[in-house]
From Swiss-Prot:
GO terms for molecular function: small ribosomal subunit rRNA binding; structural constituent of ribosome. InterPro entries: Ribosomal_bS6, Ribosomal_bS6_sf, Ribosomal_S6_plastid/chlpt, Transl_elong_EF1B/ribsomal_bS6. HAMAP family: Ribosomal_bS6. Binds together with bS18 to 16S ribosomal RNA. The gene is rpsF. SUPFAM superfamilies: Ribosomal protein S6. It comes from Jannaschia sp. (strain CCS1). This is Small ribosomal subunit protein bS6.
Length: 117
């Protein structure tokens, strides 16, 4: 099975619990089709650079999965049909990084940052 990373943006008018329930729902879809969810992260409500479907903000979620391509295609299809999901990005990776994603790390812990002037 292949390793994937997914980022999903849900509508801003959902509650935090509803946004996290979407992660569980799509994780169950993946599990029903022979895949597994390795890790999920809820990044919270963030402001977007431009409006999507008349929304300026959205609930961002991040999933790391290990699944066959058929399961990922079915999950993406259902995500795109779901009214609460605005955007989905799926990337196939060679290996999952250990620990939290860059978005979840504190600013001081990130590598490669230079001092501000």
């Amino acid at each position: 099975m292949a390793l994937y990373e997914h980022v999903m943006i849900a509508r801003q008018d959902l509650s935090n619990a509803q946004a996290e329930a979407l992660n569980e729902h799509f994780g169950a879809v993946l599990a029903d089709n022979g895949g597994t969810v390795v890790d999920t992260e809820y990044w919270g409500v963030k402001t977007m650079a431009y409006k999507i479907n008349k929304n300026r903000k959205g609930h961002y979620s991040y999933l790391r999965t290990d699944a066959p391509s058929d399961a990922v295609q079915e999950m993406e299809r259902l995500m795109r049909l779901h009214d609460d999901v605005m955007r989905v990005l799926t990337i196939k990776v060679d290996a999952h990084d250990e620990g939290p994603s860059v978005q979840m790390q504190k600013r001081d812990e990130r590598e490669g940052r230079r001092e501000r002037r």
